[in-house]
Amino acid sequence: MRVEEGRIPFRGHETWYRSVGDGPGVPLLVLHGGPGSTHLGLTPLEQLGDERRVVLYDQLGSGNSSKPSEPSLWTVELFLAELENVRQALGLEQVHLLGHSWGGMLAQEYALIRPEGLVSLVLSSSLSSAALWREESLRLRAALPSEIREPLDAHEAAGTTDDPEYERAILAFLHRHLCRLDPWPPLVEEVLRSTNLEVYRTMWGPSEAHPTGVLAGWDVTARLGEIHVPALVLCGRYDEATPLQAETIAQGLPDAELVIFEESAHMAPVEETDRYLATVRAFLARVDLRNP
């Protein structure tokens, strides 16, 4: 398969991208999570390059892209503009858009603009409401053993989330609701290690459970009916982006399918790679057939 890597100028910085495949299907553009994570956790999607072009990129501040240390930069508007810039630079006139976690939030925002040539959405382990995420996070927390739950609550209340005790407790939570493979594959370790905490904390906050940053009041649930492209909504049974959140998205969209991966948490592309890829592949093929 054809592989291409490059950098796209964007507002005085550069966005790094990787393009795999050049088959006849409508291209797939992939949006990673975080905010502040990288494309690495979604590299299994490159296997779909046997049927279509698959483009992954590191959002500004992340991975191989420019990393300006300017907290005022980190807004939804910036990342929407970057997405459109990537699409135009690479000539993606028609495109399927797959967003994972925060990337799914960005994908919903983009779809609400009703851009020309958007063929479908795949919303993977995502959310439509920061408030519902908070409620579901508290529910998941309540089910944790006290030796995990209490340090999480205490250090978040005290603002000491850099304390080693907190880090051990959050790691135990992540083994339940981020990735359930034991041990974690090196890919998962690298995704966590490479996260840009300035971007993450500015956009989301210091705690996974309690959004306090730019996205704290984010909610597009009431507007999902405005998105008229076919959509595939995905999550893991043990996902921190819980099945209730996935169901909320799927019910709000006019044309959506919902698939839950029974052995996965938040990283189904890594935890159940074969089933995840088969599910996405089949959906894209069905939509391509409907697309004139």
Question: In which residue ranges do the predicted regions lie?
Answer:
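Alpha/beta-hydrolase active-site loop signature
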Residues: 35-36, 59-63, 103, 128, ...
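Catalytic active-site module of serine/aspartate enzymes centered on a nucleophile-bearing elbow/loop
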Residues: 255-292
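N-terminal cap/lid segment of alpha/beta-hydrolase-fold proteins
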Residues: 1-14
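Conserved HGGG/HGGXW glycine-rich cap/lid loop of the alpha/beta-hydrolase fold
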Residues: 11-68, 72
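Conserved loop-alpha-helix segment in the C-terminal half of the alpha/beta-hydrolase fold
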Residues: 214-264
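Active-site loop/oxyanion-hole signature of alpha/beta-hydrolase fold enzymes
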Residues: 55-102, 106, 278
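Conserved hydrolase catalytic core segment
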Residues: 93-136
